[in-house]
Amino acid sequence: MATAGEESQTQAGRHQEVGHKSLLQSDALYQYILETSVYPREPEPMKELREITAKHPWNIMTTSADEGQFLNMLLKLINAKNTMEIGVFTGYSLLATALALPDDGKILAMDINRENYELGLPVIQKAGVADKIDFREGPALPILDQLIEDGKQGSFDFIFVDADKDNYLNYHKRLIELVKVGGLIGYDNTLWNGSVVAPPDAPLRKYVRYYRDFVLELNKALAADPRIEICMLPVGDGITLCRRIQLSI
């Protein structure tokens, strides 16, 4: 029978196996998903951008290929036309969105680093979807406040957030106003490398440990928000979909 110490070590070791490629505990199973249904159907521009991003020193920040495929299909299913993305990086998820939208679809994209976006921009332009994107460099909160001041409440069909986790709740307070009733907000990284269930003494990378409490706080708040229906999925690093069902509290 395992002792408490042995069990703690087992849990910590198990946590180390989770999250470095996906939340699946088997790399072989994740590779099977990628090689069977993701990579063979990945649009050529997305493949090119994924390979460019893989060479970036911060490549861990990119949306995974399976999540990109999921977002692309989701946007088609809900017939999204007017969308927003907070946190762009090199633009992999942005490209997945742009390819899914109709010719007159629009994406308001925000990131504090234009340089990373411009790394992927030639691929986006070659794919013929750059005209759908309105990129704004800088913090998102002032832009969101201005949208509300300009009367843009309820004007977005879909909003994807993959940015600074310590601001997720601040974003939510504003995005719930900007997404339409029946529209979706997708919060990325809501299982945060699996750390949301890691024991207190688990060996976590510094940035994972720092943002863990913010992710836990967000998850708790979303679960209690009566204005939305939610669905948390173990795709990529965890994504929580929030469907707005109520105008206000």
UniProtKB/Swiss-Prot annotation:
Cofactor(s) for this UniProt protein: a divalent metal cation
InterPro entries to which the protein is assigned, alphabetical: Cation-dep_OMT, SAM-dependent_MTases_sf, SAM_O-MeTrfase
Binding-site residues, S-adenosyl-L-methionine: 63, 85, 87-88, 93, 111, 140, 164
Chain sites annotated for binding a divalent metal cation: 162, 188-189
Entry keywords, A to Z: Lignin biosynthesis, Metal-binding, Methyltransferase, S-adenosyl-L-methionine, Transferase
The record's free-text note on cofactor binding: Binds 1 divalent metal cation per subunit.
GO molecular function: caffeoyl-CoA O-methyltransferase activity; metal ion binding
Pathway the protein contributes to: Aromatic compound metabolism; phenylpropanoid biosynthesis
Keyword tRNA processing appears in the UniProt entry: no
SUPFAM superfamilies registered for this protein in UniProt: S-adenosyl-L-methionine-dependent methyltransferases
Amino-acid positions noted as binding substrate in the UniProt annotation, renumbered to this chain: 21, 162, 193
CDD domains: AdoMet_MTases
Entry-linked PROSITE patterns: SAM_OMT_I (PS51682)
EC supergroup of this enzyme: transferase
Record flagged with keyword Metal-binding: yes
GO annotation terms (biological process): lignin biosynthetic process; methylation
Record Gene3D superfamilies: Vaccinia Virus protein VP39
Entry EC no(s): 2.1.1.104
Catalytic activity: (E)-caffeoyl-CoA + S-adenosyl-L-methionine = (E)-feruloyl-CoA + S-adenosyl-L-homocysteine + H(+)
SUBUNIT field: Homodimer.
Chain's role: Methylates caffeoyl-CoA to feruloyl-CoA and 5-hydroxyferuloyl-CoA to sinapoyl-CoA. Plays a role in the synthesis of feruloylated polysaccharides. Involved in the reinforcement of the plant cell wall. Also involved in the responding to wounding or pathogen challenge by the increased formation of cell wall-bound ferulic acid polymers.
Family: Belongs to the class I-like SAM-binding methyltransferase superfamily. Cation-dependent O-methyltransferase family. CCoAMT subfamily.
Protein name: Caffeoyl-CoA O-methyltransferase
Taxonomic classification: Eukaryota, Viridiplantae, Streptophyta, Embryophyta, Tracheophyta
